[in-house]
């Protein structure tokens, strides 16, 4: 037979969607700088942007937040200073030069995610042990286009790609910049283990781009559950430890048996790798 997986139907009632839209319209309009300041007051994330030499937290929080916003919008210090009051381009540039680094952005992101994880409302969506990861492509323009790569899957325009991990509580635990031409599967385990949040993820969902035989095998070794959403599953072969007749209904989808002798021969090396 042929394996056919029927997509799940939406379980959101129409009334709930209408209520969501109604509530969304009640949200007040907030300026992004004000929102960043409020999030900092809740979490203290701006203190994670420590000085490159002294390790001190930034003294001018407003300039630091303006620098974060300048990075996030690609406006740069001059245009950002022109859009804000009381902050100069020099102040923003100084903060970016001495406080904004990849490791401080990572620490700030973890600070926000941890505060989100500890908030009792986050338990409504999940307990933080399940997550999903996926790549996002962002088209480049102007000068950035000359330093970017092209992946025809996303069209003929150059751009950059970020591989992000999101918990079931909707908190990011990992955001990795990668080349648009690279396989996403290489970064699945990097994001899962190399992060600074308090999340303890036991099950990970990915799309087809995040899967490979190596990822399947390593998840078994590390005791985590890998749950990919595979494209064209009817054309795929599954490799099992049992004999092929153990799954008669899936006979057309069972490939070569797993070579257990080869696994045992290299068991110690596999454990060191995991």
Language model features with spans:
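A generic structural signal for ordered alpha-helices
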Residues: 10-17, 51, 58-59, 70, ...
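Catalytic or ion-translocation cores adjacent to nucleophile or general acid/base/metal-coordination motifs
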Residues: 82-120, 151-268
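Structured nucleic-acid-interacting core domains from mobile-element enzymes and related host factors
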Residues: 110-149
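Charge-patterned, long linear interaction tracts outside catalytic cores
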Residues: 271-274
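Structured, charged N-terminal subsegments at the starts of enzyme catalytic cores
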Residues: 1-83
């Amino acid at each position: 037979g042929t394996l056919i997986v029927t997509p799940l139907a939406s379980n959101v009632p129409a009334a709930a969607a209408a209520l969501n839209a109604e509530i969304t319209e009640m949200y007040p309009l907030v300026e992004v700088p004000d929102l960043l300041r409020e999030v900092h007051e809740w979490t203290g994330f701006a203190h994670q942007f420590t000085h490159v030499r002294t390790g001190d937290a930034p003294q001018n929080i407003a300039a630091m937040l303006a620098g974060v916003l300048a990075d996030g919008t690609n406006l740069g210090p001059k245009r950002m200073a022109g859009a804000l009051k009381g902050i100069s381009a020099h102040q923003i540039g100084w903060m970016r030069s001495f406080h904004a680094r990849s490791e401080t952005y990572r620490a700030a992101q973890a600070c926000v995610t941890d505060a989100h994880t500890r908030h009792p409302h986050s338990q409504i969506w999940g307990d933080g042990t399940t997550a999903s990861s996926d790549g996002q492509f962002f088209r480049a323009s102007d000068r950035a286009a000359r330093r970017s790569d092209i992946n025809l899957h996303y069209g003929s325009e150059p751009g950059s790609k970020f591989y992000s991990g999101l918990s079931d509580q909707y908190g990011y635990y990992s955001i990795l910049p990668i080349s648009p031409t690279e396989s996403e599967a290489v970064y699945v385990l990097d994001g899962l283990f190399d992060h600074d949040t308090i999340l303890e993820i036991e099950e990970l969902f990915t799309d087809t781009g995040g899967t490979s035989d190596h990822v399947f095998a390593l998840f078994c070794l590390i005791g985590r559950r890998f749950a990919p959403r595979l494209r064209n599953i009817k054309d795929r072969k599954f490799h099992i430890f049992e004999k092929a007749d153990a799954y008669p209904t899936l006979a057309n989808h069972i490939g070569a048996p797993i070579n257990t002798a080869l696994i045992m021969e290299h068991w110690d090396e596999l454990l060191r790798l995991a």
